[in-house]
Amino acid sequence: PGRIIDLFGGRKDLQRARVRMTSDAVFADDPVRILRGFRFCAQLGFTLDPATQQRLQEQAGLLSQAAPERISAELYKLFASPACCPVVRQMDQTGVLEILFPELSPLKGCQQNEYHHLDVWAHSLEALKHMEDILECLPDVFPNSWKALQELLETYQNRAVLKLGVLFHDLGKPDTQGLNPKTGRITFYGH
């Protein structure tokens, strides 16, 4: 009574704000734990232990064996977190995002016109970051309608769908990219 039994060093992980796997088989036993690790990072502001990140990167392909409804449940919770953008970047760096959303890959390196200083992928991530910033200060940005917006975004599903929409907002650009022969300007008609 009153004594904490900590077989895996969880207290130290909490103090260090780290998410760490408890065994090498943890992701093979349940691939959805890959997403859960990222979700915990997003929700708690934690970071992945380097060995854990390496292992989930190696086993990310196992996500294709997981039930889609379990994957979507974790993704909704992850994207509903106030600051998921850094975690989405990390998911991209580990290859997890490409497994979940292969349609995002063509955005990388897709150059834009002079109105954009970033390629489409970097722009999409930047847009997600700005959306998160806006959501944190709705009354300042929308002084007359922030309460209605906040009510719409009360459920984690609505908040997640908004952020996913922002991340995917330029998905059509790679397929519609063209070059105006007269001006030499990059175009995206119909995106």
Q: At which residue positions do the language-model features occur?
A:
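Glycine- and charge-enriched loop/helix tracts that form the active or gating conduit
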Residues: 1-159, 163, 173-190
